[in-house]
């Protein structure tokens, strides 16, 4: 367990690993990260994933950011993420919307408000 290890997210953000658990049954590593970003916005999912890949020698397609929660004005975010052993396991367990979110693609929902105002 690498408790209290530091991870550099960007020039303005640094994370401290608060919890690192190996879940052998599922085939993933479950990490809780506290990110300090005083004076700047919440780091993007892509920045967090890049930092985790470097820190844990993993691959981008095996890391999923489950949740980023930031209190207004605090400059501190709590991040929950998973690192999987294989893409196959990841796709069976993680919801598709999270995979799309981490990849930077958006899911298109049923109707759109933009199309309602443009009539004939």
From Swiss-Prot:
Residues 101-120 are annotated as: Disordered. This is Small ribosomal subunit protein eS24. HAMAP family: Ribosomal_eS24. GO terms for biological process: translation. Keywords: Ribonucleoprotein, Ribosomal protein. It comes from Saccharolobus islandicus (strain M.14.25 / Kamchatka #1). SUPFAM superfamilies: Ribosomal proteins S24e, L23 and L15e (SSF54189). One of its GO terms (cellular component) is ribonucleoprotein complex. InterPro entries: eRP_eS24_sf, Ribosomal_eS24, Ribosomal_eS24_CS, Ribosomal_uL23/eL15/eS24_sf. Gene3D superfamilies: 3.30.70.3370. One of its GO terms (molecular function) is structural constituent of ribosome. The keyword Acyltransferase does not apply. Pfam families: Ribosomal_S24e. Belongs to the eukaryotic ribosomal protein eS24 family. It comes from the Archaea.
């Amino acid at each position: 367990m690498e408790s209290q290890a530091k991870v550099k997210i960007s020039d303005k953000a640094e994370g401290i690993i608060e919890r690192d658990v190996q879940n052998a049954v599922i085939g993933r590593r479950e990490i809780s990260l506290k990110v300090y970003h005083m004076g700047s916005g919440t780091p993007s999912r892509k920045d967090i994933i890049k930092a985790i890949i470097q820190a844990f020698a993993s691959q981008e397609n095996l890391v999923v950011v489950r949740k980023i929660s930031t209190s207004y004005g605090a400059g501190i975010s709590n991040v929950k993420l998973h690192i999987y052993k294989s893409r196959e396991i990841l796709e069976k367990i993680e919801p598709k919307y999270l995979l799309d979110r981490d990849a930077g693609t958006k899911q298109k929902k049923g109707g759109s408000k933009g199309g309602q105002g443009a009539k004939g």
